[in-house]
């Protein structure tokens, strides 16, 4: 199981939210590029970036910071936040990211997702963010009527290779992942499932690996020191 450190961008800084609430923002650094280099040095094979301002605005806004990060590290960088049309997705790849994460558009316009998968293949990742199993959209500020399991099945049928599942109620809380909801998305020959939200201990990562989860995105726990990335990678990815 791959461990993926998260960098959430807001106003050019590295921040974390609690349960997606923009009013509960903690700043963890003014130099996201240095943070990305830190995670690469710790052994990360991939870095996860969310443009929080972009998610709220409906279009990417932190483009200069994102481009600086992709130039500063040699590992793949995946980007989410405000990518809701073909033009913004093409522009994201121009910034040097290896993968884009689509959330709202998967609910609103699955036909576009199918078209993008045909064009970009495995570089298209779907982000399913849910409260009580129901998918949220618009930077978590709106709720759809679609269940996460239904959306995951639909995306798999469209050829999506990877899905990131975030339990919003756990995100930034350092409680524990929602094992049941996350595992419910794992299907034979279906998309690889990556867990996000609530991870606070290496034991949480080990449990996710046992459930057949392909990857785990770690945010708050890295910035608070609850998890040491280099040590966790050694334990989880390399078997101790």
UniProtKB/Swiss-Prot annotation:
A single GO BP term for this record reads: L-tryptophan biosynthetic process
EC numbers on record: 5.3.1.16
InterPro entries registered for this protein in UniProt: Aldolase_TIM (IPR013785), His_biosynth (IPR006062), HisA_bact_arch (IPR006063), Isoase_HisA-like (IPR044524), Isoase_HisA-like_bact (IPR023016), RibuloseP-bd_barrel (IPR011060)
Report the catalytic activity.
Answer: 1-(5-phospho-beta-D-ribosyl)-5-[(5-phospho-beta-D-ribosylamino)methylideneamino]imidazole-4-carboxamide = 5-[(5-phospho-1-deoxy-D-ribulos-1-ylimino)methylamino]-1-(5-phospho-beta-D-ribosyl)imidazole-4-carboxamide
Coiled-coil stretches noted in the UniProt entry, renumbered to this chain: none
Top-level lineage group: Bacteria
> Which principal EC class is assigned to this enzyme?
isomerase
Active site per the UniProt annotation: 8, 129
Q: Name one GO cellular component term.
A: cytoplasm
An example of a GO molecular function for this protein is: 1-(5-phosphoribosyl)-5-[(5-phosphoribosylamino)methylideneamino]imidazole-4-carboxamide isomerase activity
The record's subcellular location field reads:
Cytoplasm
UniProtKB keywords:
Amino-acid biosynthesis, Cytoplasm, Histidine biosynthesis, Isomerase
- Pathway of action: Amino-acid biosynthesis; L-histidine biosynthesis; L-histidine from 5-phospho-alpha-D-ribose 1-diphosphate: step 4/9
Q: Which Pfam families match?
A: His_biosynth
Stored NCBIfam families: 1-(5-phosphoribosyl)-5-[(5-phosphoribosylamino)methylideneamino]imidazole-4-carboxamide isomerase
Family stated for the protein in its record: Belongs to the HisA/HisF family.
Protein name stated in the entry: 1-(5-phosphoribosyl)-5-[(5-phosphoribosylamino)methylideneamino] imidazole-4-carboxamide isomerase
Q: Which organism is it from?
A: Herpetosiphon aurantiacus (strain ATCC 23779 / DSM 785 / 114-95)
């Amino acid at each position: 199981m791959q461990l993926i450190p998260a960098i959430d961008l807001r106003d050019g800084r590295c921040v974390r939210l609690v349960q997606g609430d923009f009013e509960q923002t903690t700043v963890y650094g003014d130099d996201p590029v240095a943070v990305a280099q830190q995670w690469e040095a710790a052994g990360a094979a991939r870095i996860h970036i969310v443009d929080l301002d972009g998610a709220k605005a409906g279009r990417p806004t932190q483009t200069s910071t994102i481009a600086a990060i992709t130039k500063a590290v040699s590992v793949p960088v995946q980007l989410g936040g405000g990518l809701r049309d073909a033009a913004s997705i093409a522009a994201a790849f121009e910034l040097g990211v290896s993968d884009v994460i689509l959330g709202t558009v998967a609910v609103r316009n699955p036909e576009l997702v199918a078209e993008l998968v045909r064009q970009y293949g495995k570089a298209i990742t779907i982000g399913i963010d849910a409260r009580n199993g129901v998918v949220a959209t618009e930077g978590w500020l709106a709720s759809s009527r679609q269940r996460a399991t239904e959306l995951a099945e639909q995306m798999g049928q469209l050829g999506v290779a990877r899905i990131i599942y975030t339990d919003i109620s756990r995100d930034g809380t350092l409680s524990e992942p929602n094992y049941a909801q996350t595992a419910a998305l794992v299907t034979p020959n279906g998309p690889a499932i990556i867990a996000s939200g609530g991870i606070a201990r290496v034991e949480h990562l080990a449990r996710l690996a046992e459930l057949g989860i392909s990857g785990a995105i770690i945010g708050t726990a890295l910035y608070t020191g609850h998890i040491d990335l280099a040590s966790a990678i050694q334990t989880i990815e390399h078997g101790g």
